[in-house]
Amino acid sequence: MKKPVLFVLIIMLALGALCVFAGGCDGNAAKTTSYKIDAVLDTSTMTVTAEESVTFVNPYETELDCVYFHLYPAAFREGARYAPVEDRKISEAYPQGVDYGGIAVSNVTVGGEACAWEIGGEDEDMLLVTGLTLMPGDALDMAISFTLDVPQIRHRFGYYDGIINLGNWYPVLSVYEDGAWRTDPYYSSGDPFYSDTADYTVSLKAPTGWNVAGTGKISTSVDGETTTTTFTAEGVRDFALSASDKFTCVEADAGGVTVRYYYKADANAEKHLKAGADAVKTFSELYGAYAYPSLSVVLTPFLYGGMEYPQLVYVSDSLSESLLEEAIIHEIAHQWWYAAVGNDQITDAWMDEGLAEYSVTLFYEKNPDYGVDVTNRIADVMQSYVLFTEMYSELIGGDTSMNRKLCDYFSSTDYSFHTYVKGALLFDSVRHSVGDAKFFAALKTYYKNYTGKVAAPDDLIACFENESGMKLKAFFDSWVNGTVGLY
């Protein structure tokens, strides 16, 4: 997710303003999971009713007696222990007043038969299907009936100003690692999501005239007053949608990739479409070919700068012109770092956020016609980080580590400076240490070797060590553990 990282941060921090940021393991399961979701959107009540079919093949070397699903929309209900936004952001998230939503599961079956299931987890945000005997390699067919109450909020999951965002909206399988299912709740800082890749076929029936953006190849079927939009995607880490009867869509070709830009009102739509297409082409050259046939960029009411999903990104309609351009580029970089190459976003957010943020600098370096002084950009980022750590040292207790869980950052400001800003500085430092040729060779190897998988920090470090012939573990550790000196 993109939180605006601005050169003006230095000035803002100096004024004492709060930062404008948002607040190899068992995860490498073979691609054996598939989802089929048939959903109906009722725009009069802002509810979604859905039937979800999941085929899961046990890829682990252990018998499973249960399966866990995350129910992320549960965080938006009244009384949730983990609210989706920080207290200081509530008025910005809910301009019309706090409006609750959520998810209700009404039925679960296994193999077409009734089964044992319950709602659990630390915040009643997990679906547990129990009483199973699933040996390694065994297949499990599950069906889940659920209803969404979409809240009026400027967020990943919510609606505002005629646009509906459905991000992290359906029951999604948790990751099984270290002998247990991951049950991380919906933290308000960062992107508290972690999932393996799967194949998706998702249809959304909505009133005719509503335009739907989503993950994957798109097809539509009109039946009088309703239109069903169907998306298919293979080997993706998540699936998201956005819908509105006010969307305009423009398209461009980026080396064989169809780039779409959806917006309600944007006088510079063609410019932003071009930035998106240029980003796809630039990162394909730097890292390796874009992994999917299409990409949709959606300008939407959103509390933060942007949010990444496979083949679909949200960018906030409240950003300034320069920030909107940066958000588009940053979120598209996530198609390489998060969508294709996964990592644990809850414990190692610096891996994808740091690379995505540094990719913005690389984009401007490779596209000088955009008029951004890259040298000054890096210097300003360094200065803003040093100033932040000096001014907030009492609050953060001197902890400048980057390997904290999302819940261990004292605020989204702390999180952003240590995953985005310091993360970008880390990769700039690696580049200067190993040289351009080996730096980009390592990233290409990383992308090639870990697309469709979940990479651990040591996997990333090994790519740089192998390409450079240098021992870099201690170098990375000093940055990640917070012992490196930055001045």
Model segments located where?
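Zinc-dependent metallopeptidase catalytic helix centered on the HExxH motif
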Residues: V315-L387
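Positively charged n-region of N-terminal signal peptides that target proteins for export
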Residues: M1-F7, D99
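Asparagine-centered strand-capping/turn motif at beta-strand->loop junctions
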Residues: F56-Y60
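N-terminal, polar/Ser/Thr-rich
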Residues: G16-T49
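Amphipathic alpha-helical substructures
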Residues: G371, S416-Y487
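Extended, low-hydrophobicity, Ser/Thr/Pro/Gly-biased non-transmembrane segments
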Residues: S91-G101, S106, E118, M142-A240
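Hydrophobic helix-coil surface modules that form long, contiguous segments used
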Residues: D191-I329
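Solvent-exposed beta-hairpin/edge-strand motifs
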Residues: Y68-E113
